[in-house]
Amino acid sequence: MVRSLSRDRSGMSNLAAFAVLILAIALILGVYYVYLVPQAAPEPLRAQERDSVTVEYVGTFENSELVFDTSVITVAQDNASYPKAFSFGWRDRWQPLQFAVGDGSMIRGFDQGVRGLAVGESRTLVVPYADGYGAADPSKISTRRLLESVPVRLTMNATHFLATYRTSAVSGINVTDPVWGWTAVVSVAGSIVTVMNSPVPDQAIRPYNLWDATVVSIDDSANGGVGEILVQHRLDPTMIDRIGGKVDGQDFFLSDVDLIEGSYTLDFNRQVAGRSLLFQVTLKTLLRP
């Protein structure tokens, strides 16, 4: 029996239609997966050894909100939102910090802390002093009384006098004490220079020209004739880390005020030494060699 040619043509037509349908479905699925199904983003580069990076940062002390350093000019300008530590310094240019990870130019805690960051990511770094600027030297820390005793008479040689008062010792001249700001009278006997401090009771003074104080009393014959001036310092804990100055060429800052103990502390170390530091860092660029 001869098969019908028309039926064969129908079967071929159905097969072609089925193939077209499969192709259409494949195209639709392809479009769906390519354009509509979210694709996993490629893993970003993360900072590692030898990468050249730039970061923005704000550095504060762990036990306070005071900013001691930053690369961000808006932070530098805003003292209300970002109060500053004594050691904070203004600079001519404000820009992200650039360095090569692991090149030794950064403190260890900062260098280690930026590793693993991708561009645009931020992180808070807690840097103990051992990974920061090292321990403080205890010999450079001086604790004194808020009601402080100062001698009326000081004796020294001419070299010491010149270094302290920035003038040659001549009997009868008046000098200004570089710490207390009051007048003192000079007398010279051979190689010995005597300086007699001459404030008056209730005199308002500004030690180191930094804070207010008052001369409480003067006993000219106390301590075997050396004499004693009692000075009451007007300090409080809100001033800690905020004020500092220079004496004999050395920088210092107010590191403690203990109203219960009646004491205050001046620290001649770097303000970042011996302290845990916080850095808010954001990775801005990353270049891998």
What is the predicted role of each segment?
Residues 2-289:
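FKBP-type peptidyl-prolyl cis-trans isomerases
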